[in-house]
Amino acid sequence: MDSQRNLLIIALLFVSFMIWQAWEQDKNPQPQQQTTQTTTTAAGSAADQGVPASGQGKLITVKTDVLELTINTNGGDIEQALLLAYPKTLKSTEPFQLLETTPQFVYQAQSGLTGRDGPDNPANGPRPLYNVDKEAFVLADGQDELVIPLTYTDKAGNVFTKTFTLKRGGYAVNVGYSVQNASEKPLEVSTFGQLKQTAALPTSRDTQTGGLSTMHTFRGAAFSTADSKYEKYKFDTILDNENLNVSTKNGWVAMLQQYFTTAWVPRNNGTNNFYTANLGNGVVAIGYKSQPVLVQPGQTDKLQSTLWVGPAIQDKMAAVAPHLDLTVDYGWLWFISQPLFKLLKFIHSFLGNWGFSIIVITFIVRGIMYPLTKAQYTSMAKMRMLQPKIQAMRERLGDDKQRQSQEMMALYKAEKVNPLGGCFPLIIQMPIFLALYYMLSASVELRHAPFILWIHDLSAQDPYYILPIIMGATMFFIQKMSPTTVTDPMQQKIMTFMPVIFTVFFLWFPSGLVVYYIVSNLVTIIQQQLIYRGLEKRGLHSREKKKS
C-alpha cells in the first residue's frame, strides 16, 4: 500500500458514505422503541388524552431580549415564537420563526389543565378564555424577569391562573398554574403540554442548506423517559397512526429540527403519560399528561411545567432537563461528535473564532494520531522495499495463486511487515472526519459562524469554491510528493484524477469541514517530510524523484 492507493481507499469510503447517506435519508428505519408501547389509533387521538383543539381568542405579545412570543388567550397556547438573536438567513435582519400559526403551516406549543375538572377538558366545554390586563408585555431595561398572568373563572367560581415566566437571555419558559377551589367538592385536574406541527415542512422554513453533500439532520418528535435517555419518533410513524403511549416519571417530550428544539418538561413528582397523535390534515402531535391532582374545597394548589423554545444550545438545555441536550442530532457518530464539540467549544472560549478553533482542533487530532501516521508510512516504506522480492516470487510461481499467497504471507511474517498497516490510520481518521461533518451540520453555535475574509458561515459551503480548490491543490501536492509502486495504467489514471474528484466532492461541503481538511493536508505534508527523513536514515526511503 502507498499514499496514492490510500487516496483511492479514502475516495471509496467517501462514495460509500454518500450512498449510505442517501439511503438513510430515503429509508431511515424507525429506531427501536425498547421502553415504549405503541398503539394504533384514529386521527385526532389527542382528544382521548383530554387535550383540546385550538380556538380563537385575543392575541397578546411577549417580548424579551431573545424571544418574542404570541399567546392566544383562548387556552393560553403559544402560537408564534420568534428567536430574536437568530436571523432567518445569513444576510437577513428578520428573526427566525420557530413557532407559527398560518393556514399553510402550524407549529404550536399548547398547554393547560385537563382531567375531570380541568377547564381544558373538551368534555367540560370550550377552552377557557383567559383574562389579561394588557396585550403586550416587554422586558424592560434592567429587568431580569417577565411575568404574564392569565386568569379564568369558571361558572362555579373556581379561579384558574396560568402564569408564563421568562428570564432575560433565556429560552426556558416556566408555565405555572394556580387552582383555587371555590366549590364544595374536590377538583381533579392534570397538567398537559403538547407540541403540534404540520408534518410537511414548507421550503421557506427549511433550515437545511441543500446541495449534494448536505447532511440532513433529523426532523421529528423525540422523548426521554426514566428508562431511556433519548428516543426519536418519526412524523411518518405518527401519520401512520402508530402512536406512542408510555408512562414514566420525569423525562420530556420534544419536536426537533436542524439547530432548534421545542420541548415540554413536566415539573411534578408523579407519573406522566407521554403520547403522540395524528390530528388529521397532516398535523401531528407529541405531548404529556400528568397524573391527576386533587384540590380540596377552599384550597389553592400550584402546578408547574417548563417549555424550551429556541436554539439547541446543549449546556443550557441540559440545565433545564437531563438528556435534553441529546436532541442535538449528531447521528450514529454522536459518541465522537459530542466530545469533539466540547473540545471545540473549549478552544473557542479562548480564541473567539470558530474557524481558528477548527484549525487548532485539527492540529490536536493529527498530533494525537502522529504515532499511527508514522507507523503507516513505515509500513508503506517496508512494503515498497519488498516489491522486488514480491515481483521475483510472482515471476517464479507464475499462475499458481495459492502458492503466491502462501509465500507472500510468509515473506510478510519474516520481514515483520503488516500489509494492512497503511490502512489502519485511514480507518481511524474517517470516523473523526464524519463526526466533524455531523457536528458542523447540527451545532447551532456554528450556524452563521464567520471565519475570515469571504467565509461568513462555516456551516455552509464556500460561495466562491476557493477552499475546495485549495484543498484539491494540497491533495495534488501530497500525491506528487508520495512515492508509488503502482504500475497498472488504470490505477494510475484514477489516482491522477483523485484530487479533482475530491475537489468536486468538497464543493458543497460545509466550509468548516473544508478548512479542517486543508489544515489536515498541510499537517500531512509536514509530517510526511519529517517521517521520510527518519526513514532515510534507516534505509527505508530514497529522495529519488517520484516517477510520473
Swiss-Prot record:
It is a multi-pass membrane protein. The chain crosses the membrane at residues 6-26, 345-365, 420-440, 458-478, 499-519. One of its GO terms (cellular component) is plasma membrane. Belongs to the OXA1/ALB3/YidC family. Type 1 subfamily. The keyword Transmembrane applies. This is Membrane protein insertase YidC. Keywords: Cell inner membrane, Cell membrane, Chaperone, Membrane, Protein transport, Transmembrane, Transmembrane helix, Transport. Residues 28-52 are annotated as: Disordered. GO terms for biological process: protein insertion into membrane; protein transport. Required for the insertion and/or proper folding and/or complex formation of integral membrane proteins into the membrane. Involved in integration of membrane proteins that insert both dependently and independently of the Sec translocase complex, as well as at least some lipoproteins. Aids folding of multispanning membrane proteins. The keyword Membrane applies. The gene is yidC. Pfam families: 60KD_IMP, YidC_periplas. GO terms for molecular function: membrane insertase activity. Interacts with the Sec translocase complex via SecD. Specifically interacts with transmembrane segments of nascent integral membrane proteins during membrane integration. Residues 29-41 have a biased composition (Low complexity). It is found in: Cell inner membrane.
